[in-house]
Amino acid sequence: MLVRGYVVSRKLFASILIGALLGIGAPPSAHAGADDVVDSSKSFVMENFSSYHGTKPGYVDSIQKGIQKPKSGTQGNYDDDWKGFYSTDNKYDAAGYSVDNENPLSGKAGGVVKVTYPGLTKVLALKVDNAETIKKELGLSLTEPLMEQVGTEEFIKRFGDGASRVVLSLPFAEGSSSVEYINNWEQAKALSVELEINFETRGKRGQDAMYEYMAQACAGNRVRRSVGSSLSCINLDWDVIRDKTKTKIESLKEHGPIKNKMSESPNKTVSEEKAKQYLEEFHQTALEHPELSELKTVTGTNPVFAGANYAAWAVNVAQVIDSETADNLEKTTAALSILPGIGSVMGIADGAVHHNTEEIVAQSIALSSLMVAQAIPLVGELVDIGFAAYNFVESIINLFQVVHNSYNRPAYSPGHKTQPFLHDGYAVSWNTVEDSIIRTGFQGESGHDIKITAENTPLPIAGVLLPTIPGKLDVNKSKTHISVNGRKIRMRCRAIDGDVTFCRPKSPVYVGNGVHANLHVAFHRSSSEKIHSNEISSDSIGVLGYQKTVDHTKVNSKLSLFFEIKS
């Protein structure tokens, strides 16, 4: 479930209410359905209960003065039932929320704080995150927001087991051992705040520090990535890679054969075919430079590193960068999403030389940055080659940090319960038959899970197309998210037609080679009016993958999962 509001950053599923199945002083009917929504084995009472919260840039100092409910914004969640202060039991997961999602390429990050309640706190672990179901089974008001009721004296008396407050908990994300906590805003004011780590002091290198910190969370994990090889989380020194990359770019630019090749550039808009031809020749010339010797070795053994792939990728990235409508995130995402297997092209994924990963990464980024800088004038305006290359280095390093972190999360079994749909290298399916049914005739929420993986090469997930009926069946933007090997990633949703909403991940998402994704789609019904099949524009949800060319037109690979409308 999506969180966010003021300093929260990662989305934390919100819900956990109920634990005290014993119902001290409460009538039997109050807990009649508690077993269906409360996990008593994971509920507990603790003195001086602590958890961790990730805060965005600009809020590290203010949050240490105390927790306050923001006067505007989402106040922790888009859904009124789940507005609250979010935290987690894992400080490394909390760190992942310290990046400003609206400006992810700034390089900045906030920090992590440890928050602690005085006295006794009851943690109620929930089995489900559907607020309507929880309120119904717990005998709560169906019209009052869930988290507001959690903070009432009546609720605390019924479910607190003598504690001063009740905090709800849910799994942090599918496949994760971490949990998230949802705190009532008024109760959260009692939290004492202690700084755990501050990334703001690193300025534009704050995200580097954040990823270095997060790498500690998986230092002991051995993740099976391909036959015959396994890796723990690789803690690459991105400062060193950045410096190495820029040094290599300077050396490459001044090398005679490369300099001559650069002078042969058309330096004006040309056809896509001619641009690719020139870039492929540039790639071949550059690989003869000693600074790219490791990369040349890899290129000779893995066809995905071939010059034609680099050239096609560079042209596509340049086209996106040249677009006046593409925002920063779209521009950088293009670097990894345009070409299938681009992770391998850049020297990160399986198949690359692992004994010298740092050097391979630096060489890959140096060559890629130069090629993109060369490609931009071929598809759009003239730019300074050095400036464009260095700018792209920063973008690609930030993006790789995100992707690399996702790759190195522990894998989990996708657990398909329906027949997967195979297309363009992807495998997509509903998690259960029930997920494929959209029920109407009631007011409230529903969640639907989709499993996504790839057969071999890592492939990108560009987004999802969701049919809607404005005012009757809308997308709950705060709860729609995608989880990659246990790590939740927010999605940015917008209406592209009156009856279609497009949601795309706010960070690059890849599946394949042991990496699986769970797409959680949430719908909201503001009316109890029944919906008929002929009212909705489409009877399928479209999962979008990599770009390909069909009849000279670029389109995304699309996998359609059909659903039923039932009342």
Curated annotation (Swiss-Prot):
One annotated GO molecular function: toxin activity
Gene3D superfamilies referenced in this protein's UniProt entry, alphabetically: Diphtheria Toxin, domain 1, Diphtheria toxin, receptor-binding domain, Diphtheria toxin, translocation domain
Name listed for the protein in its UniProt record: Diphtheria toxin
Site (Cleavage): 225-226
Organism: Corynephage beta
Subunit and partners: Homodimer.
Signal sequence segment: 1-32
Matches recorded under Pfam families: Diphtheria_C (PF02763), Diphtheria_R (PF01324), Diphtheria_T (PF02764)
